[in-house]
Amino acid sequence: MCDTIVATPAYTKNGKMLFAKNSDRSPNEPQFLQHIPAKDYDLQKTPTLTLTYVAVPQVEHTFEITISRPSWMWGAEFGFNEFGLNIGNEAVFTKEKYVKTDGVTGMDMLRLALERCRSAKEALDFLTEFIEKYPQGGNCGYGKKFYYHNSFLIADSSDAYVLETAGKYWVWKKVKDFFAISNCLCLESYDACSAGLVENAIKNGWCKSKTDFNFVKCYTEPLFTKFAKGRERRVKAMELLGEGSPDVKKFISILRSHAGKAERGYQEVGSICMHAGGVIGDQTTASYVAEIDGADSVYFVTGASLPCISLFKPYVLGKNEHVAEDGEDKKGVGYWLTHEKMLRYFISGTLLTNEIIEKGRAAENEWIDRFLSATKEDRVAISEDAFEQDERLVLKQLDDARTKQISFTRGGAYYRIFWKNKTKKLYEFIKKENKEK
């Protein structure tokens, strides 16, 4: 479960494209930032590229990217490249059959597009051609079986597109002012569609004729879509975007918005900032906001769960001491786990959050303001400083809590049992990771 939002230059406060995503996945699944430099390949030696489940032809050159990657996948939940191309994907549930083995995940497609495309339109064309050639699918769950199709929000400094898919079929629409996608099909009108889209719906009895056709109504699988509550989250995101003239801080506040009561630990699946603990146990495990300006684009990343508590650090594409490089998966996982250990104290109610949040937000506001007003040359140093401040805050909280046992006192019985079991498994995973170092 996820939420991705965009606002075009014609609508934003400073005339630059804004883009953001909350990635909602299993609360114990590490998801880390990874910088991957541009690369050249000898296709005689490496003709193919292995994705999460399948291999596809390699290309001679791939572009520099930074991605947010679930630790066990090749692909990514969101990311951006050296040209300022940004992409986020969503799980959508459709009536088309899911390919359960030998499929290409939406995350794999996202990373491929970032590595191979310079613009939003080029990425859109790449993705529509790709899903017609390669079946999307494969298990996308962590510790569970979870199958779905994908929608994508794609943006560069000037253009943004929504792409929704159902198996090999697709529709897309260009964004005029602002848009939000979630875990539901939403394009009842579109600018283009795949061949056979309407005919397939008629053949399957989902509509009677071309005049009767509605993509959302015909292709939506109703049960999973209902329980995912993507429609509710999308309505809220569109409402907040509709308040007008958004900037970076407004986008951050949207990612932090809750549907439930603030004093309750559990924020249901209908909340943009999602807290696990209900029957559907997903949680926001990584977040980011982009201000897109081509090669001068800037980013604000959590690299951690729960954006309502975690801080958004400024980042520019390139090497950063706190961001994993290609091949440094354990470093990336370790960064996420350190933050996750601290967050479990807050989730449990063992540590009070208000004072910590206020202190962290003050630091966050200061470094965002400095970063946005700084020269390109100064931004790298400000970014490193922000990551270091964040690390000190996290380590201090862990140090303050070292004598306290995590005791889940918030929420109902199901919530407490859920988090007790998840945290036990998390520490077993941490112990295993430490042994393998």
Label the predicted regions.
Residues 1-10, 263-272, 408:
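Short, Gly/Pro- and small/polar-rich lid/capping loops
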Residues 2-106, 126-249:
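A contiguous strand-loop segment
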Residues 110-117:
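Short, well-ordered beta-strand elements within core beta-sheets of diverse protein domains
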Residues 123-132, 248-262, 384:
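Short, well-structured alpha-helical segments that form the helix of a local strand-helix-strand
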Residues 250-282:
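Short N-terminal edge-element motif at the start of the domain
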